[in-house]
C-alpha cells in the first residue's frame, strides 16, 4: 500500500446533488421546488413569524411583566466555597475574581453548607446564623 493509491471505500462518498440539469437527473426543470407558489420563486421565503399579513402571534399576545430597576442581584455562596478563594480578605470582588459568583452580582449571602477548614476574614457579605458560627468556629472573623 502506498499513500498515492489510498482511496475511500466504495459508496462512502456521494456526489453533490446538481439541480436543474435535465430530466434524467431526477432534479431537472423545477429542481425539486414543485410548481408555482412563493417557495418556488427566487428569494421566495418570508421572515420567521410571518403569517401572510395576518397579525402574527407575537403581536397578538399582550406584553407581560417588567424588569425592576431595584431588583436585588443577590448571589448565594456556600461556606465550602469560601475556602476556594485564596485572598486574605473575602469580599464581593474576591469572590468574582475566583469565579465563585457571577460578575453581575451586587450582593452576596453566605449560608452554611460544607465545612470552613481555615480561618478566613469575611468583609461586606451577609451571612446566615449557621455560616457566621462556622466562620468564627474556624478562627475567622467577620467585618461588616
Curated annotation (Swiss-Prot):
GO terms for molecular function: rRNA binding; structural constituent of ribosome. GO terms for cellular component: cytosolic large ribosomal subunit. Keywords: Ribonucleoprotein, Ribosomal protein, RNA-binding, rRNA-binding. Residues 21-31 have a biased composition (Gly residues). It comes from the Bacteria. GO terms for biological process: translation. SUPFAM superfamilies: Ribosomal proteins L15p and L18e. InterPro entries: Ribosomal_uL15, Ribosomal_uL15/eL18, Ribosomal_uL15/eL18_sf, Ribosomal_uL15_bac-type. Residues 1-54 are annotated as: Disordered. Binds to the 23S rRNA. HAMAP family: Ribosomal_uL15 (MF_01341). Part of the 50S ribosomal subunit. Belongs to the universal ribosomal protein uL15 family. This is Large ribosomal subunit protein uL15.
